[in-house]
Amino acid sequence: MRTTILCLALCTGLVCAGPASAADAPAASACKSTVSGDLRLHTLKSTIFGNERTIRVLLPPGYDDTVNKERRYPVLYMLDGQNVFDACLSDVSHHEWSVDETAQQLITGKKIPPLIVVGVDHAGRDRAREYLPYKDFVGNPDMDEPAGKLFPDFMTREVMPLVDSQYRTLPGQPNTGIGGSSYGGVATLYALLAKPGTFGYGLIESPVMWIGMGQLVRDTSPLVAMPVKVFVAFGGKETPDPVISEKMIGLVRQVETNFHAAGYDDSNFRFVVDPDAVHTEAAWEKRLPGALTFLFGDWKPTPTPQP
């Protein structure tokens, strides 16, 4: 029974606390896009995964102004790109992260620097296979063999070169972040560990840390990869069972302990428990201003060393 509950709560194509009713789902033709700002779309054909997806690039205010024509920007890559900017594309919770509105408000208010946000769409029914480096024996035991160990290479060899070739990005670990939720949070943490010289900032929401029977937790001890800053958050009601939710929080606390053992403190690793929050984009949207401010509030441009 517990496995069934967990699978319903965590292992749908797009995660949420529970399935929305049909009445909540706007018809595609009737749904009005909620995108705010200058969002540009690209189609990426992946050799690594053998499929294609949309890459959604949100440019900061003033990007095309003449005064900024030589300016380069840090980049935050967000997984599950369908859910990042537009509620019409979020076909389970029908809610978005509102990264576009939130980022623009924080930039205009000078809480964070102007940055480019890239939404990387998931692969639909292959989402779990692409995001997970280890099998989810608890919540999704019948899943295909995971291919998530290829995901960091997919980002660095296919997604990032596309973005860098089209936009004025600031390359390098001090200028590059990655974020995601649930299985996307797992992929985010794995990318931070697998590509320590690439991703300097991690935004990890509601990660499913029992994958591989806890192997990803063990991967953080000893901690070899050293990102600049990491923000992790979890809701107190991620599942209907409070015992399971507390055990999930305990796994993330072990990751926090491992980061602290490597020298991190509250200035560069933050773990937030949101007591009444469930497993949905609405919760991640609510915590987003604090996450972005923590990660990028004191960011300064760091030039890439020349060979």
Question: Where on the chain are the PLM-derived regions?
Answer:
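Positively charged n-region of N-terminal signal peptides that target proteins for export
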Residues: 1-4
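Non-catalytic cap/lid and distal C-terminal segments of serine-dependent acyl enzymes
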Residues: 23-307
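Sec/Tat signal peptide C-region and signal peptidase I cleavage site
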Residues: 18-22
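Bacterial N-terminal signal peptides
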Residues: 7-16
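Alpha-helical and His/Cys-centered functional microenvironments
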Residues: 6-7, 283
